[in-house]
Amino acid sequence: MSRYRGPRLRIIRRLQNLPGLTNKLVESKKNKVSGSDQSIQKKVSQYGIRLEAKQRLRFNYGLTERQLLNYVRIARCAKGSTGQILLQLLEMRLDNILFRLGFVPTIPSARQLINHRHILVNNRIVDVPSFHCKPKDIITIGAPKTYQSILSKRIESFAKDQIPEHLTLSLSEPKKPKGFVNYLINRESIGLKINELLVVEYYSRKA
């Protein structure tokens, strides 16, 4: 299954707000159901609940079905909680790190910057959005000056208290912002509200 490129509002109306996909907020279809309609709503099966959790994770981080399945398999082979390791793997992707630092408004925007070779990790160009960031990595923008100026204004308007503790944003040089990875993210700092165990259960027969 390929990466979704259709209308984003359609997705968040169905799956509720996904910060990585879009910064627009809408009321989900579930909340719009009138009192008379509630009595005729179909009861959601356990499979349906797990499927929705999986879809929320996939669309928020902009993954294909195959990519997410591969991450689940990696998480299953690692020591510790499979669900938490899965979230950690997704959160430490370069495209998500750029988003959490406030460099860009969404993960798709981050992916575009990376694909255009505008992002450096430890002074080396990285053009792979799925690049796994590690503690002590330093992330900078190598874009043209005009583009850098736009990005620096975006970062200045981004509230620093929104940046999770495992990351640090340095604005000592306003036109050359730097992001630092302090350590691997913990569960409390995950930006998406989700029950990761439902995703693990969904893939229990596939991974």
Curated annotation (Swiss-Prot):
Annotated compartments: Plastid, Chloroplast
Entry-linked Pfam families: Ribosomal_S4, S4
Domain of life: Eukaryota
Keyword Ion transport attributed: no
GO biological process, one term: ribosomal small subunit biogenesis
Disulfide bonds: none
GO MF terms, alphabetically ordered: rRNA binding; structural constituent of ribosome
Subunit structure: Part of the 30S ribosomal subunit. Contacts protein S5. The interaction surface between S4 and S5 is involved in control of translational fidelity.
Family according to the record: Belongs to the universal ribosomal protein uS4 family.
Protein name: Small ribosomal subunit protein uS4c
